[in-house]
């Protein structure tokens, strides 16, 4: 169930980004949160099929946590890394990952 994994990972990524945006009062946080909810809805629709395929439903929580941790780490590197090159690289990597998710639902 590659789709379920992608949807869960993207939900986690967007949740981390929306959390950060909300913390700094970024006006895009609401839009990001709506995208997160969209991925959660897609994942919820697939979960019965994931279970039927013999995949533990808890896997979706792990996939979501992986996506959240991935973006949280990149956000940390982007903001706090002493080397500007590493910070730019983290921002670019994060943008690519978020863009990958956004393109799935547009």
Model region roles, listed by residue range:
Residues 2-51:
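Short N-proximal segments of mature Sec-exported proteins
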Residues 40-106:
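Compact alpha-helical subdomains of small soluble proteins
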Residues 1-2, 57:
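Generic hydrophobic-segment detector
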């Amino acid at each position: 169930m590659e789709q379920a994994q992608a949807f869960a990972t993207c939900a986690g990524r967007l949740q981390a980004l929306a959390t950060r945006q909300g913390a700094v009062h970024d006006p895009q946080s609401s839009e990001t949160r709506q995208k997160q909810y969209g991925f959660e809805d897609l994942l919820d629709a697939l979960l019965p099929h994931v279970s039927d395929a013999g995949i533990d439903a808890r896997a979706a929580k792990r996939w979501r946590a992986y996506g959240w941790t991935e973006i949280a780490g990149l956000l940390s590197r982007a903001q706090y890394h002493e080397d500007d090159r590493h910070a730019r690289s983290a921002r670019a990597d994060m943008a690519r990952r978020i863009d990958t998710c956004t393109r799935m639902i547009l």
